[in-house]
């Protein structure tokens, strides 16, 4: 891809990170050299990816080229959404308030809580027996 008339955004969520390049086009979304429908089997993940574009009504106006790595399906979808949002803001700064109101600009800082010593999981204690 050439650097002319394209915008870039980096998105992160959980342990996933996505690099999003947008340029004027017909609405084609390519993730890791695969179509959106092929890459994400679940409709919910596809919906999450499309949310910022649908909000600003640019679904058919921009082509997206995305590389994403790390994490699982949900984290990758969230990272892509965050990256698309940042790329859209670079493309047109006037979209920021609309995207901010929808909550797409803020990076979701929630992470998996670590497992503690003496517990079964992060917070799950071993079963207590009185006798």
Curated annotation (Swiss-Prot):
Gene3D superfamilies: 3.30.230.10. The keyword Cell cycle does not apply. The keyword Ribonucleoprotein applies. One of its GO terms (molecular function) is structural constituent of ribosome. Keywords: Ribonucleoprotein, Ribosomal protein. HAMAP family: Ribosomal_uS9_B. This is Small ribosomal subunit protein uS9. It comes from Mannheimia succiniciproducens (strain KCTC 0769BP / MBEL55E).
């Amino acid at each position: 891809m050439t650097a002319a008339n394209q915008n870039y955004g980096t998105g992160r969520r959980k342990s996933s990170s996505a690099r999003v390049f947008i340029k004027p086009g017909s609405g084609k979304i390519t993730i890791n050299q695969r179509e959106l429908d092929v890459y994400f089997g679940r409709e919910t993940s596809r919906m999450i990816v499309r949310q910022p574009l649908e909000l600003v009504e640019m679904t058919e106006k921009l082509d997206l080229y995305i590389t994403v790595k790390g994490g699982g399906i949900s984290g990758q979808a969230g990272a892509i959404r965050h990256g698309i949002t940042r790329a859209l803001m670079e493309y047109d700064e006037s979209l920021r308030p609309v995207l901010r109101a929808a909550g797409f600009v803020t990076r979701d800082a929630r992470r998996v809580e670590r497992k503690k010593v003496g517990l079964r999981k992060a917070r799950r204690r071993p079963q207590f027996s009185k006798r």
